[in-house]
């Protein structure tokens, strides 16, 4: 019933743009709005909407749809693969990536509107096909950005008015991959629309746990859908609606040749080959956004209502999980978020542009967990018998987030701009807190081709509510799942001071280079780990944290040649775990209480780059990743273990692509592509199964050959 009500709500939300003009009767008349007028008005409103937000003083990187299409794989890859080409983006297992030493500090926005966090771990909610352009805003962020501090991914969606038509694509190849997809956009009178969808299946849904190209039990089926519709009411107003869906099923991959090591017996069975384990996880996300934009002279305002439903279900192997882990946990979580966001900009004069906004979000979190465990003797700790018992934990919780900001973009001199403001955030969930955060950024352009930025931001980042657990530890006393540590302090919001200094230099009209540096000092630094069989990340706090680093970037554009390169170095450390302690060993907690350790997602050296060349209808492309490796535990000769004290070996991955447009062969709209992923077939570890909050070993993808055919119409 929950899901049915939500689906009806999203459907109604999608239909609203069509109903509004009828209700307003005379507001919009397609006979008096020629197509060209609508297109020009849409372009004007897009430009005005972009003025609501400012990136003054922040580090901003832009990837447009042409750049995505030009890379190996094009828009057939998942979103995380596109984002790995952002400076200082370190890849991790489960499709995660970490920007500037932050575990999960990313906030997605669609046309400037916040998309609340979801529960999904492996699944990618947003397909790259919806992107007209993607802005990654990092560093010292202006006051309109909050709640997440590592980076803002603001996606400008395709609309259909500026580039009508569509495509149908069939893509597939290695690892049993097959992915049909489509997109279509157009206009009719004052209405414009864009839709896209795909169905992905392959046998490498999650990273291989043993480095093989054919991991056991690793099939995935995924559906992604997205739709955008807008109604231009008049030259100053428009209503737009967005709906999206991601539905993904994953098999949890198995290791080969393993046997249970706990010495347990379940219903008379004590052996269980790891090849026979059968764990599965399903992740579903649905969202809808309805927006009204008004632009008149110096004033532009956009107000939106939004809803997001996210569910995750894990089905264990009932016997195998008990034998290997001492617990078989059937878990279901659902988080529904409702929100209101309103942002406005007013150009007071040539020197001052004022911006202000508010954001409200209400979440409900429902959790059903049924854990099968074995009872143990309270004195010996040994199982009483081999008969599983069930522990049921159902819970309902809620969260409220309230935010507001005001800021002024002040052009002090022709070559100097200051953006300063205040932001207030308050949240109330498993814990509560609030903060008034000052922000100030400067941009100095001493020469036409030189831009320097300097900024300070105070950040307040609540823990991801949808991931916070609510286990009652006492229920697991005298069972095979009893934690060694019984302390479970609530996760708190991270508070930090952030400093950023950078420079960008246009060497020529074709070549641009940049340098950026940053330093973050945090209290109650939020990190996440994967504990137990359900692949659900759990947040926890380090009492103290520091993150700092440097970035070098370069890009070159001339004719049909485009090239870029990024190099980053970072250090991310934390001390004293002060929440969710029951997930850790007592020895681990004791060491971290007295020592700063590297965060498990720190990668000290990260590099990426790519190039593409268009020649007579054929595009040749290549990109690469290089990393010094994420952290792992260090085992000393005397037997002492240092959490996250080592890092995995350096790795590189090189990808190639060739795409040809058959226009000159008389086949209008037909293109074909060949992509080679991991050209050199490098076998490299992303995780080795050790480290704070690290789950199973996982490896990067082995060499894969993929083919695609696209017909435009």
Question: Which ranges hold each PLM region?
Answer:
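Conserved C-terminal beta-signal and adjacent last beta-strands/turns
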Residues: 11, 185, 230-234, 596-713
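Membrane-embedded beta-barrel scaffold of Gram-negative outer-membrane proteins
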Residues: 295-316, 445, 467, 489-559, ...
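N-terminal periplasmic "start-of-domain" segments of outer-membrane beta-barrel proteins
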Residues: 37-73, 104-107, 134
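Extracytoplasmic beta-strand/coil segments of soluble accessory domains associated
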Residues: 79-115, 132
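N-terminal periplasmic accessory domains that precede
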Residues: 79-82, 97, 121-122, 136, ...
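Gram-negative outer-membrane beta-barrel transporters
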Residues: 413, 513-521, 540-636
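Short acidic/polar hinge/loop motifs at secondary-structure boundaries
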Residues: 113-139
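Transmembrane beta-barrel wall of Gram-negative outer-membrane proteins
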Residues: 172-201, 212-253, 280-300, 348-349
């Amino acid at each position: 019933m929950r899901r049915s009500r939500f689906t009806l709500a999203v459907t109604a939300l999608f239909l609203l743009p069509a109903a509004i003009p009828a209700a307003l009767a005379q507001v919009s008349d397609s006979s008096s709005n020629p197509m060209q007028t609508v297109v020009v008005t849409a372009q004007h409103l897009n430009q005005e909407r972009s003025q609501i937000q400012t990136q003054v003083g922040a580090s901003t990187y832009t990837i447009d749809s042409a750049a995505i299409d030009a890379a190996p794989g094009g828009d057939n890859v998942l979103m995380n693969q596109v984002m790995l080409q952002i400076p200082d983006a370190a890849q991790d297992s489960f499709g995660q990536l970490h920007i500037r030493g932050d575990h999960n500090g990313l906030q997605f926005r669609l046309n400037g509107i916040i998309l609340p966090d979801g529960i999904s771990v492996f699944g990618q909610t947003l397909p790259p096909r919806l992107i007209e352009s993607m802005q990654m805003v990092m560093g010292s962020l202006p006051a309109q950005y909050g709640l997440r501090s590592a980076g803002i991914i603001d996606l400008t969606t395709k609309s259909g008015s500026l580039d009508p038509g569509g495509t149908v694509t069939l893509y597939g190849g290695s690892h049993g991959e097959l992915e049909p997809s489509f997109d279509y956009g157009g206009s009719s009178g004052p209405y414009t629309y864009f839709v896209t969808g795909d169905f992905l299946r392959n046998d490498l849904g999650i990273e291989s746990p043993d480095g093989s190209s054919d991991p056991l039990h690793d099939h995935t089926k995924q559906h992604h859908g997205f739709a955008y519709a807008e109604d231009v009411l008049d030259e100053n107003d428009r209503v737009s609606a967005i709906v999206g869906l991601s539905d993904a099923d994953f098999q949890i991959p198995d290791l080969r040749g393993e046997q249970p090591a706990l010495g347990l017996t379940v219903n008379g069975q004590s052996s269980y080959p790891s090849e026979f384990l059968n764990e599965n996880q399903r992740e579903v996300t649905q969202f809808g956004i309805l927006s009204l934009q008004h632009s008149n002279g110096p004033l532009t305002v956009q107000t939106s209502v939004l809803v997001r439903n996210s569910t995750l279900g894990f089905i264990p192997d009932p016997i195998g999980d008990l034998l290997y882990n001492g617990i078989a946990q059937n878990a279901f979580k659902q988080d529904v978020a409702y929100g209101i966001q309103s942002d406005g900009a007013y150009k007071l004069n040539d020197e001052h542009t004022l911006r202000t906004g508010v954001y409200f979000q209400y979440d409900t979190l429902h959790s059903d967990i049924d854990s099968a465990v074995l009872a143990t003797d309270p004195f010996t700790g040994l199982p009483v018998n081999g008969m599983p018992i069930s522990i049921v934990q159902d819970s309902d919780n809620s969260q409220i987030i309230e935010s507001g900001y005001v800021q002024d973009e002040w052009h002090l001199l022709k070559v100097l701009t200051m953006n300063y403001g205040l932001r207030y955030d308050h949240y109330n969930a498993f814990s509560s807190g609030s903060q008034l955060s000052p922000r100030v950024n400067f941009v100095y352009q001493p020469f036409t081709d030189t831009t320097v930025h300097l900024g300070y931001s105070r950040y307040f980042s609540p823990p991801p509510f949808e991931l916070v657990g609510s286990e009652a530890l006492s229920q697991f006393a005298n069972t095979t799942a009893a934690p060694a540590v019984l302390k479970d302090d609530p996760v708190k919001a991270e508070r930090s001071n952030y400093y950023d200094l950078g420079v960008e230099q246009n060497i020529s009209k074709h070549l641009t280079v940049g340098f950026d540096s940053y330093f973050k000092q945090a209290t109650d630094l939020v990190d996440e780990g994967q504990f137990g069989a359900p692949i659900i990340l759990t947040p926890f706090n380090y009492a103290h944290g520091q993150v700092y680093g440097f970035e070098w970037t370069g890009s070159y554009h001339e004719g049909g040649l485009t090239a870029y390169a990024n190099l980053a170095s970072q250090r991310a450390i934390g001390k004293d775990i002060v929440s969710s302690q029951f997930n850790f060993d007592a020895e681990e907690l004791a060491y971290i209480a007295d020592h700063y350790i590297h965060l498990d997602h720190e990668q000290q050296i990260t590099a990426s780059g790519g190039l593409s060349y268009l020649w007579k209808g054929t595009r040749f492309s290549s990109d690469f990743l290089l990393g010094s490796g994420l952290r792992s535990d260090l085992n000393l000769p005397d037997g002492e273990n240092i959490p996250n004290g080592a890092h995995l070996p350096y790795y590189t991955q090189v990808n190639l692509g060739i795409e040809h447009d058959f226009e000159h062969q008389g086949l209008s709209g037909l293109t074909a592509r060949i992509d080679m992923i991991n050209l050199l077939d490098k076998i490299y570890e992303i995780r080795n199964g050790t480290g704070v909050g690290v789950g199973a070993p996982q490896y990067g993808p082995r060499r894969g050959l993929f083919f695609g055919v696209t017909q435009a119409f």
